[in-house]
Amino acid sequence: MNQEEKLLQEVSAIAHRLKELHNDAVIAYTPQVQELCDKKATQNEVEKMLDWLLMYAGDERMLKLYKQVCRTYWQIYPESIAFYIMEYRKEYDRESLIGTEYEYLLHEDEMDEK
């Protein structure tokens, strides 16, 4: 096996493990999100859940859970939910910021490095 084949095999194994990790996250977080949305959670509880879900929001199933929390608590904690929606957009949907008043957020990382 040459170097290129070995590298391809290693990358494939990492991709497979990442897919398993996302599957595990969906299984673990689905009942937690349901429980959170079925009660009047504190702002801190909602923010912690969204922090965890944001890490996996690139997966459509996790994004669905993320949106469920946002929709459930939008009217109760509007500032927090608006913040987490913007965090999602900055991380996973950067194109949606182009041409908006939030376009400057696309350059935050560059400003932090200076």
What are these regions (language model features)?
Residues M1-A13:
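Short, charged, low-complexity amphipathic alpha-helix
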Residues E5-L8, T30-Q34, D51, D59, ...:
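Intrinsically disordered, low-complexity regions
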Residues S12, H22, D109-E110:
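Generic low-complexity, intrinsically disordered sequence content enriched
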Residues H16-Q68:
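Amphipathic alpha-helical interaction modules
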Residues M62-K114:
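Amphipathic alpha-helical binding modules
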